[in-house]
């Protein structure tokens, strides 16, 4: 039987065998008048064909899905189906972009919040001595004396950080919230203080690095967050004095004449450091993509971002319809991460069977690896962490008595009901 089919230009130049295979996969079960049913076995020859076609290769004329009803003729979608499938794909990619690249937007808003208070370069440090409820931080502790700043290695070149002795745990994270280095007790200075030399992605390592703890960051923008503690009387004065006396950041090129430091009290300021949970999330993310080196993200992640219009060197200008779709994707993502963060589905994160307390580091890894990496990355645990918490360091995961720190989280009472701020719990 001779079959006439509408062939797209994409088929030109294909061999007869290849063309036949493509047609077999694409054709619907009703390709010849719409009267025959799906073939029942892989050895059957459907009407209109000359060769057996397995059932699983056939496309029905109409398919009902959660994304809508898709209609096909000879395996080719009609205009409504094509548009719906493309819109659904963009929604999926926007949803995945929100979850997967959330760490970048989170740390970017930390940087922006600091900048709004005058912490605009490495010579300015925000002291939170201590922190009250005015500044919006995800996991700021009110009994910790923080020293916090951002530095840009593209502007400074190799940067020296002088850490004073006696500080608690400190951490450097890159612009994708990845771990770069620990300082203080869990770091190589072991709480005795020392000089750290941070190299950027474009920097060559100096010939002489004697006297420095050397680390390299894959990003230009980096966050230095340091912790000190209240004294026995609950006062921050001693910690503040230690910061002001010993904390220094300066380019290696200025080591012989370091610039003066400015310390800004930010513990009571009114400002925000939390990423948006609406369309503006993508604008925050675009700031990172435009500023940072191309290799901050691997090609797979860059492709995910560019599929919704976020590409280095190009303006992010979604249409009104695209903007609406991106907004919806964020809202669906927020619903998921709120649900799993408050009541994680992974039983392994709970400290005790049948209890509510859990760790934010699923898998016992600051990289959220499953079985040491055999199972890849625990995406739920990673998403939960960066939506609700900040600072990424192995010192918050590994059992380092007297040096690191461990965190437990609870969001529900003994019955599994969410905690209510208007109630008292024992």
Tell where the protein language model's regions lie, with residue ranges.
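Bacterial N-terminal signal peptides that target proteins for export
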Residues: 3-17
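Hydrophobic alpha-helical segments
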Residues: 17-18, 91
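C-terminal motif of bacterial Sec signal peptides marking the signal peptidase cleavage site
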Residues: 23-26
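Bacterial signal peptide processing site
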Residues: 28-31
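A compositional/structural signature for long, glycine/proline-rich flexible linkers
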Residues: 36-426
